[in-house]
Amino acid sequence: MIAYCGTTTMSDDIDWLHSRRGVCKVDLYSPKGQQDQDRKVICFVDVSTLNVEDKDSKGAAGSRSEGELNLETLEEKEIIVIKDTEKQDQSKTEGSVCLFKQAPSDPISVLNWLLNDLQKYALGFQHALSPSASSCKHKVGDLEGDYSKIPSENCYSVYADQVNFDYLNKGPQNLRLEMAASKNTNNNQSPSNPATKSPSNQRSVATPEGECSMDDLSFYVNRLSSLVIQMARKEIKDKLEGGSKCLHHSMYTSGDKGKTSPRSAVSKIASEMAHEAVELTSSEMRGNGEDCRDGRKTFLYSEMCNKNKCGEKQQMCPKDSKEFADSISKGLMVYANQVASDMMVSVMKTLKVHSCGKPIPACVVLKRVLLKHTKEIVSDLIDSCMKNLHNITGVLMTDSDFVSAVKRNLFNHGKQNAADIMEAMLKRLVSALLGEKKETKSQSLAYATLKAGTNDPKCKNQSLEFSAMKAEMKGKDKCKSKADPCCKSLTSAERVSEHILKESLTMWNNQKQGNQGKVTNKVCCTSKDEKREKISPSTDSLAKDLIVSALMLIQYHLTQQAKGKDPCEEECPGSSMGYMSQSAQYEKCGGGQSSKSLSMKHFETRGAPGPSTCMKENQLESQKMDMSNMVLSLIQKLLSESPFSCDELTESDNKRCCDPRSSKAAPMAKRPEEQCQDNAELDFISGMKQMNRQFIDQLVESVMKLCLIMAKYSNNGAALAELEEQAALVGSGSRCGRDAMMSQNYSETPGPEVIVNNQCSTTNLQKQLQAVLQWIAASQFNVPMLYFMGDDDGQLEKLPEVSAKAAEKGYSVGDLLQEVMKFAKERQLDEAVGNMARKQLLDWLLANL
């Protein structure tokens, strides 16, 4: 017999994360010498992985029979358990089949995804281990076959059918089966009203309030479509001889593809029905097509199901449409119009009644439909856009004329506005350097002179090299009286610096226009007899010097800002201003450290707390310095990775690390070395292409590395924060969860041994994850020994070792589930970053348990 009923899901009350149940033993099934033991056999079947041929040929009778066993419309939150209620005396093994649909992995909420699958396996174990009569709630009525009424007070009659079931590999046996359909939701369901009105309503689950427990739009559409199908089925059923005959159908495992199943009675009857319906329809249509609806004649039509469950279409297809299309088109349109109007009215009524008095707005339904369709095409859309963009940019960048034109326009624009850019940059730098004044300290800023000029009349463009500016902080008398802020005036150093900057900018503008002005700088006077370096005739040197000068000036400003905090470090030894030692160490190592290691070193220096008087100030200063340290390390990394000449880098380092006198002598010492480079003149076009391409490639590579590092560590930080948030949320309810666990009426006595056969896994990871979740569910129900059958590829051979290790270390069900959550979280993080996980689940558990 087959009985549909709603059950109260005992597994919904389980606090899986805090369950203290011990794990059971696990082993691989071996049929030798184990035939006479009392055990249960559970076969988990994922209906989404069944072959279409098996569904059409073998399962057609079951899906279209009076019992409404349609596996194609099985939802993700619904399971079907088929049990052997007539246990044979000579066999102590009782079999069950659990039909469900595997839900896809959810990268947003790993916990809900794992608990959803775990609930399905727990429901399968619950119904398989429970007594046969406990899963029915009302009484079984008389059957029209050879079976009689079962004397039980807690069963009810829905519809009975004899099933020919192929049980494992022991040959077909006539078994009396019981089917229990339950919803995997968080609300307990206690059916009180048997749905016995029509066979099409067998799968609906009623609640005491009279409302449907599902609030999904697809359920109502499927239910409405079943009513339309029932109308056509009733007309076809009238043509059968003996409409109350018992139907037979067969169920076979998906692995028996080579076997030819015997044609069942339902298949024969269905073929006869279709043949007779076609003949009757053809004869009636030859007579008069418009009288078909009034005369209660039948049309054979097929159902087109939308697999996304967003809606279903009914398309009526007459077999002889080519010959009689003109005569029956009007009748078909009238019939389709009536069916469509009835469906719309029924949909509105159903939504109004079964949605707690609040109909679902049309915009919400449209949003669901759009989201489901958008998720399927967004990946292809992104791939096509990136491919087209790559093709376009690849063709343009290989075109030398296009590249040269872009670079020419870019550098012409930069050449015209170079003076304004340099002036604004230097003014901002001077204001930043002279903005923060100490009352107890005076600033003596010594600026190195600006060297400019040329001895080569062929050079049209003149370069301007700014040497690094060094600030010397000299302490004055601390007892000096405070000056009036209103009477403050510019110091001599400020006036000299402003005068030098103005003169240098004026001189540089004159040289750019071709006016050879006289150099008034002392260093230029002393170096008249020396041969000056030759400037590259290409315009890209101006842009390169501009970028290098900007980076060096920003680097110098950050270094001097950190240097100015040294006296504060001496007063507060535990503060976090120890960056200068790190910067010096960075320069000694040649800039080999990355920004990550530099920032980690800076965090380590903050370990020792300082005195209580300056703790708050130190924390604020440390937050400001962290950002400047990261920017400084990034600039140093860009300068070290960019293809500049060694002479320019060493010259800038000497200017940065020495006093003003040594900085003046440094360019003079480099004159003989630069004379060797003056002899080699590069062509304008070739030099621009080579240098610009190499420079741009290096900059792009450095920026991409930085973006990858930032994306990787930001994702990990967000993931760790999410894990901590989930752990805190779960920990808040741990006490009430444990109290609820103590009040549950689970059987403490060990139950029978269970053999599990899985026919739903497609990948190795999914197969191992499914086996571990089934192990957790079996442990919760006190299964002493769990056997796994059908491990032909050897993916579960390490599972007994994992179970032995977990039992040895005292792991519980909740501890094991938390370890599985960690593995799933780490794997999704690796996939998001682009790293594929090498270890499988069982290998990871062996290494981390």
UniProtKB/Swiss-Prot annotation:
Domain comment as written in the entry: RI-alpha binding site, predicted to form an amphipathic helix, could participate in protein-protein interactions with a complementary surface on the R-subunit dimer.
InterPro entries given in the database record: AKAP_110, AKAP_110_C, RII-bd_1, SPHK1-interactor_AKAP_110
Gene Ontology CC annotation, any one: sperm midpiece
Task performed by this protein: Major structural component of sperm fibrous sheath. Plays a role in sperm motility.
Protein name according to UniProt: A-kinase anchor protein 4
GO molecular function, one term: protein kinase A binding
Highest rank taxon of the organism: Eukaryota
Residue ranges, annotated region (Disordered): 183-210
BP GO annotations: cell surface receptor protein serine/threonine kinase signaling pathway; establishment of localization in cell; establishment of protein localization; flagellated sperm motility; protein localization; sperm flagellum assembly; spermatogenesis
Modification(s) after translation: Phosphorylated by STK33 during sperm flagella assembly.
Record PTM Phosphothreonine, positions in chain: 207, 506
Lineage: Eukaryota, Metazoa, Chordata, Craniata, Vertebrata
Chain spans, region PKA-RI and PKA-RII subunit binding domain: 219-232
Organism encoding this protein: Mus musculus (Mouse)
Tissues expressing this chain: Expressed in the fibrous sheath of spermatozoa (at protein level). Expressed in step 1 to step 6 spermatids, abundance then increases during steps 8 to 12, abundance decreases thereafter.
Composition-biased stretches (Polar residues): 183-205
Subunit structure: Interacts with PRKAR1A and PRKAR2A. Interacts with ENO4. Interacts with QRICH2.
